[in-house]
Amino acid sequence: MPSVPSDEEFLTYNRGVIDEFRANHGVVTQPPFPVLLLTTTGARTGRRTTVPLGFAVDDDGRVYVVASKAGGPKHPAWFHNLRANESVTVELGAGSFEARAVVTTGEERDRLYRRVAGDDNAYAKNTDRVFPVIVLDGVPTPASGMHISQPQKTG
């Protein structure tokens, strides 16, 4: 099973990805899959915070992310933030979009999760929690090849 990075390791890694993303109009060398930047408003602090996330696109062209935190025992902070305030900013490629974060449930959540995780997701083996799947309503469908169509790793 993969190990779960510490919060400090996540922060250090994420800072590098964010800087590279913005310097190269949405193109990064690591991780080895396309990412978007999600900016949420802190539930307690009100401060805007940005994280890089892998993403997928469903059959209807909706962009979505999974709150896996590498299989950590708790949901990532960005997920708690968007539950308190569903208004988010998404940077995708060279564009920036205001969006509404919609937490999926039931069959829709399961279907979208299976689409990216498959039947044997290593992150899921690290924890008993169910990974939330969030549709980013208002983000246009990215260009072909700019999204993940196989199992992914998200923050």
What are these regions (language model features)?
Residues P2, A122-G155:
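C-terminal edge-of-domain segments
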Residues Y13, Q30, G46-R47, A70, ...:
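Generic, well-ordered alpha-helical segments
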Residues T29-P32, V130:
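A short, polar/charged loop/turn motif at coil->beta-strand junctions and beta-hairpin connectors
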Residues S68-P132, G138-V139:
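Short, structured beta-strand-loop surface elements
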Residues M1-T12, T40-R47, S87-S96, P142:
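N-terminal short leaders/motifs
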Residues M1-Q30, A143, G155:
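Extreme N-terminal tail/first-helix region
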Residues H25-G26, T45, N121-A124:
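Short helix-to-loop capping/linker segments positioned immediately adjacent to catalytic or ligand/cofactor-binding
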Residues P32-S68:
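Short beta-strand segments
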